[in-house]
């Protein structure tokens, strides 16, 4: 007798007539008049539960089996048999059921069998992975993460662990969470009355990182091809379906690479990870297509077979102006494209994923390489049909004098970036990279609209429960 996951039984990896034990939780129990109970047991290893057929001859049938409710944890031992019913190929003929844990009060158990609103599930985030929806999201999230690591490993990239605590603002936007051990009731002050951060833990101001990019660049300028994959933080007071205060980012950095090089890398990576989901999570994707977004599977299949379009920002503005569409946000050269503009380009005009390149310098970060026209920078956004921007990237400014001018232009103190500037002083090279918001990627794959529902414990304004 061996302990096996539910997925092994359902996919035929446990031999028919073999005796196995599965451990999991009760999804449902159905009793027949013939004295047989059908207990659906799931363990999270796949979307579908395993049906255990339980005869009333089991010694604990009356006292325990007939009292099993949704959420009870059980250990079922029995024989694998071909299932005569529809919905599953195999089931287990139970020879023993051990109740590991009861649900105290089935009437008040938040994850009872009925379907709950997604808003309610956020209030019970510690229990919501037990639902079909969040369980499927978790497995897809895992598959995407593993595929990302696999893709970069197969293409010669090294994973770099960049710090979560930093003194640098990568975006220069100032929307950062402060890290401090100072006593808020008794803050040390300088002679001018300002908070004296030299008394703080790090001897200076420190923050949670908004991006691993700058640190990633240092390793790209030594290992050539690297990527970071970890949590980032933005103290942006945005209560929208697209924003989180804590989220995960994938950020490759490539030495000796142009903007076009990383645009090609972005296309290759997205197609690779989407194909991995289609191959490895067919059961979960079937659920998303049936219950969440009927286009979920077809959208990924179209994406992996599409050729990416490319367009200059200036030309994209002309396309939008000539479209005849009435946009909520006015279109003119110099604006940051809004979601409606991005989606028009990807869904209506190009009808394919599209890379928009060479944005006005005034709406982009200091580290992006200035183009020869002096007005635009070598930046790109990858726009996907159905969501808009999914990746943002650029060629990095490798010329020290131009970088210093940009820092000054944006009111940033170049001395705060002394180590970043050193990369341009000692063997500088052209290099490029991009950032992919992992939760936005999961939202695109699953069709789950709100990013709060694709991360285990969402952190948003006024919400840091669990």
Swiss-Prot record:
GO cellular component: cytoplasm
CDD domains: AsxRS_core, EcAsnRS_like_N
E.C. number: 6.1.1.22
Main location: cytoplasm
Keyword flag Zinc-finger: no
Gene Ontology molecular function: asparagine-tRNA ligase activity; ATP binding; nucleic acid binding
Reaction(s) catalysed (UniProt annotation): tRNA(Asn) + L-asparagine + ATP = L-asparaginyl-tRNA(Asn) + AMP + diphosphate + H(+)
Pfam families (alphabetical): tRNA-synt_2, tRNA_anti-codon
GO biological process, one term: asparaginyl-tRNA aminoacylation
Phylogenetic lineage: Bacteria, Pseudomonadati, Pseudomonadota, Gammaproteobacteria, Enterobacterales
Oligomeric and partner information: Homodimer.
Protein name from the UniProt record: Asparagine--tRNA ligase
